[in-house]
């Protein structure tokens, strides 16, 4: 049975376009018997990386209670990622980039010696044998353009930790009028259905 980890990161709750697409994807995967775990990074926000947390993520014997708590949370997030075959990331574009909530997850998961390591030939990802699906929504049209700092960034981060098989579902032009919105959502749903077929 396929095991799918879904990360939602929209701050818009029921109004979220990316969450609606993720729900569509989740229904299709569950219909095929997949086990789906959903982590809503906006509803259950993670701590923001700061100096104390950064030092704590390195481990050690003399950690503050806060550092111990965040290190345990980071270990939990990494274990959750490694326990699933497929990672699905809902990544709406906010001001040309990803939501803060998603960046917080990345900062707690991308850890030297845990999800990647440095070798004589350069960095090597340690989260191997996984597949990722990015579901990204935008008010305008940014696919493959210089203004898209969502997909290239996420592909770089995922590749850095060892996840090289990455597919992307785009929902674009969603704020460019009702017709454009309907068309953008429809095309994204078609991409989802092809992806899970």
Swiss-Prot record:
Example GO molecular function: oxidoreductase activity, acting on NAD(P)H, quinone or similar compound as acceptor
Q: What is its EC number?
A: 1.6.5.-, 1.7.1.17
Bound how, and how many: what does the cofactor note say?
Binds 1 FMN per subunit.
Signal peptide position in this chain?
none
Among InterPro entries, the record links this protein to: Flavodoxin_fold, Flavoprotein-like_sf, FMN-dep_NADH:Q_OxRdtase_AzoR1, NADH:quinone_OxRdtase_FMN_depd
Tell me where on the tree of life, at the top rank, the source sits: Bacteria
Give a yes or no for keyword Metal-binding in this entry.
Answer: no
Which reactions is this enzyme annotated as catalysing?
2 a quinone + NADH + H(+) = 2 a 1,4-benzosemiquinone + NAD(+); N,N-dimethyl-1,4-phenylenediamine + anthranilate + 2 NAD(+) = 2-(4-dimethylaminophenyl)diazenylbenzoate + 2 NADH + 2 H(+)
Q: Does the keyword NAD apply?
A: yes
Enumerate the residues binding FMN: 10, 16-18, 93-96, 137-140
Q: Which cysteines are joined by disulfide bonds?
A: none
The cofactor required is:
FMN
A Pfam family this protein belongs to? Flavodoxin_2
Q: Which UniProt keywords apply?
A: Flavoprotein, FMN, NAD, Oxidoreductase
Family statement drawn from the similarity comment of this UniProt entry: Belongs to the azoreductase type 1 family.
- Cite the record's note on assembly: Homodimer.
Please explain the role this protein plays, according to its UniProt record.
Quinone reductase that provides resistance to thiol-specific stress caused by electrophilic quinones.
Which PANTHER family does the record associate with it? FMN-DEPENDENT NADH-AZOREDUCTASE 1 (PTHR43741), FMN-DEPENDENT NADH:QUINONE OXIDOREDUCTASE (PTHR43741:SF2)
Protein name per its UniProtKB record: FMN-dependent NADH:quinone oxidoreductase
């Amino acid at each position: 049975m396929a095991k799918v980890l879904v990360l939602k990161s929209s701050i818009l709750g029921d109004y979220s376009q990316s969450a609606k697409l993720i729900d569509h994807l989740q229904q299709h995967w569950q219909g095929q018997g997949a086990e789906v775990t959903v982590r809503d990074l906006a509803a259950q926000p993670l701590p923001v990386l700061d100096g104390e947390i950064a030092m704590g993520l390195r481990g050690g014997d003399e950690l503050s209670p806060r550092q111990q708590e965040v290190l345990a949370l980071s270990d939990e997030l990494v274990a959750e990622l490694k326990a699933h075959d497929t990672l699905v990331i809902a990544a709406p574009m906010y001001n040309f980039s990803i939501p803060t909530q998603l960046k917080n997850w990345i900062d707690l998961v991308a850890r030297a010696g845990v999800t990647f390591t440095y070798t004589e030939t350069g960095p090597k990802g340690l989260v191997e044998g996984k597949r990722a699906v990015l579901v990204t929504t935008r008010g305008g049209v940014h696919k493959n353009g210089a203004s898209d700092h969502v997909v290239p960034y996420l592909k770089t981060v995922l590749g850095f930790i060892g996840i090289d098989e990455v597919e992307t579902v785009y929902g674009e032009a969603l704020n460019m009028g009702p017709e454009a919105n309907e068309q953008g959502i429809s095309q994204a749903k078609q991409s989802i259905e092809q992806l899970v077929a």
